[in-house]
């Protein structure tokens, strides 16, 4: 290469280096200004000292995250700031008055948090905002009409009995049982039969276990990514081992939901079947999606349908399984309340050969115990919102638009200013006529974006508790006490292990 050519290359490299340095300086300035803006915005919300780079991340390790949260709930009234890393912060909210103000507004889900779910569940009801969310919510609400929910009770009972039959065989050999796995299979079986008109049994189908494992993998991977500054970039994440594992898990999940959708489409194509379904007063969840016409006259796309199926398949079995497992553990840990529930159910159902819709409103003490367990162990421990406009709270503190709020349902439910002796299991908190703040108890979130399937979930919990207590006495396994840890849903670090004794 000639001297002039070398000089030209050297000059280009110098220019490129200068441009690169300039871009780095601009990015550094942007990050600095962002941090200064956050410091000013959050100055009314104190928090423990944080590191300039990694924030409070060392304090909030996954396996101990709930304990520092509860310390903050006691120390900082109503809300406090939490720094994830240098330029990423949020405000933790755990006060019912604050919750009420936020949930009265139609704030969007925080994209910085929820966008990580898109490869898994797409842009369905959980992630939509604005008019698109309103239209989809209105379209899907009839799927949870009481006329639809009534016959589901029988389907739920059949799925529960399959699980209990398996438990009876297992405890004949060993009374110790880990319940999260089988409860997850049962709730998947239930949601597939009720909402997706599935004819088989997820509890005996080997494919269902691989689907549940993929769901567990996705929850762990996404929650770990949320906590990592390095993995926020989509390109870096796709190239990482975690990103490739996430892609494989998404593929398994989508294969499962595609198969469910295709089976229903095939069934509807049978002669006369589509007309029979259309004559029904209320359509099932999947049929609403398949028959839906948006207001502009176009059908939902295949992508839209799968997003809703992925969303409700996951939420309908996973969060419900978490709730049921913790409810059974709470009853196992409080035998006097367990026995009172059992006596109530025996008086109502006798031998328990059948349970119907009408029975569900006739078990008040059991319902009180379920609600108290959901207070102690809310299935979804937090939800995120991003302020679209400034907000002022009842105590006069305010936040500007653009701030992320983490509405800590777990913190709210364990707030001693809201619930005296919050760690004590006390079903009388939910006795008829007992007074409490309208936003003190939110196991299914609140406001217009509350859980659309909350009645379905409560019904299933009642069916499970009733039929289980008729067949088994429950006790905790003292050698393996569950350790609640934060996640997309509330989970236990070491599973939920019970000792079961068959009732003669």
UniProtKB/Swiss-Prot annotation:
Gene3D superfamilies listed in its UniProt record: Cytochrome P450
Tissue: Primarily expressed in liver. Low expression in kidney.
GO terms assigned for molecular function: heme binding; iron ion binding; taurochenodeoxycholate 6alpha-hydroxylase activity
E.C. no: 1.14.14.57
InterPro entries to which the protein is assigned, alphabetical: Cyt_P450, Cyt_P450_CS, Cyt_P450_E_grp-I, Cyt_P450_sf, Cytochrome_P450_Monoox
Record keyword Heme present: yes
Localization (cell): Endoplasmic reticulum membrane
Annotated binding of heme, by residue: 451
Needed co-factor(s): heme
UniProt key word NADP: yes
Membrane topology: Multi-pass membrane protein
This protein's GO CC annotations: endoplasmic reticulum membrane
Domain of life: Eukaryota
Catalytic activity line of the entry: taurochenodeoxycholate + reduced [NADPH--hemoprotein reductase] + O2 = taurohyocholate + oxidized [NADPH--hemoprotein reductase] + H2O + H(+); lithocholate + reduced [NADPH--hemoprotein reductase] + O2 = hyodeoxycholate + oxidized [NADPH--hemoprotein reductase] + H2O + H(+)
GO term, biological process aspect, one: lipid metabolic process
Functional description taken from the UniProt entry: Catalyzes the 6 alpha hydroxylation oxidation of taurodeoxycholate to produce the pig specific bile acid taurohyocholic acid.
Family: Belongs to the cytochrome P450 family.
Protein name: Taurochenodeoxycholic 6 alpha-hydroxylase
Species for this entry: Sus scrofa (Pig)
